[in-house]
């Protein structure tokens, strides 16, 4: 296997707590006051414990974009800023209103500094096809973002995404699990960051935990 692929490091991050995490699952929920403290805590941790980051890949939903902007501001606003790639492959899995993205024109107005061209694929933000919400559709989609990460030339990659979709990326989600509700002990905490190697098993790409999380 290519040495660069063997050594590719992926840092997975769940977004900060948003309004829907503690209230009704309405549309396009913002980060709440607890979430603001969480993303500041992650930012402070990264200042005290800097990690090498070559690129940040982020889901195009509001809560992930907000989390990325604040938590990683020391990387985004430095003299040579870390590039940011927005990818709909990393959006959430469920069918609650809060898991459905805004129309792209509204998202681009709220976040004008980022390139959303990857979202113009004739499907997104509709929840069908590649972005369908069934277990099988999500299971199939979850292999595509890992292939995408493998194709990037950057070695150290941060991914800012969502709780249930993280379980699909890690092959932990089971058909019998309720995608619209998972007990806290089975998901990443808000603003939790974990370190993985991206490896190919011979059949598919997998994320292997690194012991220095």
Curated annotation (Swiss-Prot):
Site feature: Transition state stabilizer: 162
EC number: 3.1.3.-
Gene3D superfamilies reported in the protein's UniProt record: Phosphoglycerate mutase-like (3.40.50.1240)
GO MF terms, alphabetically ordered: phosphatase activity
CDD domains xref list: HP_PGM_like (cd07067)
Gene Ontology CC entries for this record: cytoplasm
EC class name: hydrolase
Keyword Hydrolase in record: yes
InterPro entries reported in the protein's UniProt record: His_Pase_superF_clade-1 (IPR013078), His_PPase_superfam (IPR029033), PGM_Phosphatase (IPR050275)
Ranges in a coiled coil: none
Keywords: Hydrolase
Active site (catalytic residues): 15, 92
Protein family according to the UniProt entry: Belongs to the phosphoglycerate mutase family. BPG-dependent PGAM subfamily.
Protein name: Probable phosphatase SPBPB21E7.02c
Species of provenance: Schizosaccharomyces pombe (strain 972 / ATCC 24843) (Fission yeast)
Taxon lineage: Eukaryota, Fungi, Dikarya, Ascomycota, Taphrinomycotina
């Amino acid at each position: 296997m290519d040495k660069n692929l063997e050594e590719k490091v992926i840092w997975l991050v769940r977004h900060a707590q948003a309004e829907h995490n503690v209230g009704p699952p309405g549309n396009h929920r913002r980060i709440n006051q607890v979430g603001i403290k969480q993303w500041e805590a992650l930012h402070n941790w990264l200042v005290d414990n800097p990690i090498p980051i070559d690129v940040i890949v982020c889901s195009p939903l509001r809560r992930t974009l907000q989390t990325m902007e604040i938590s990683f501001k020391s990387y985004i606003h430095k003299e040579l800023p870390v590039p940011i790639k927005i990818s709909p492959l990393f959006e959430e899995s469920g069918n609650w209103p809060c898991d459905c993205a805004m129309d792209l024109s509204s998202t681009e107005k709220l976040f004008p500094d980022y390139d959303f061209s990857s979202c113009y694929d004739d499907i997104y933000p509709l929840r069908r096809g590649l972005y369908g919400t069934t277990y099988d559709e999500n299971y199939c989609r979850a292999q595509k973002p890992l292939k995408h990460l493998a194709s990037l030339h950057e070695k150290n990659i941060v991914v800012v995404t969502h709780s249930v979709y993280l379980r699909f990326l890690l092959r932990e989600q089971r058909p019998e699990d309720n995608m619209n509700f998972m007990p806290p002990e089975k998901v990443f905490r808000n603003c939790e960051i974990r370190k993985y190697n991206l490896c190919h098993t011979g059949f598919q790409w997998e994320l292997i935990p690194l012991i220095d999380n």
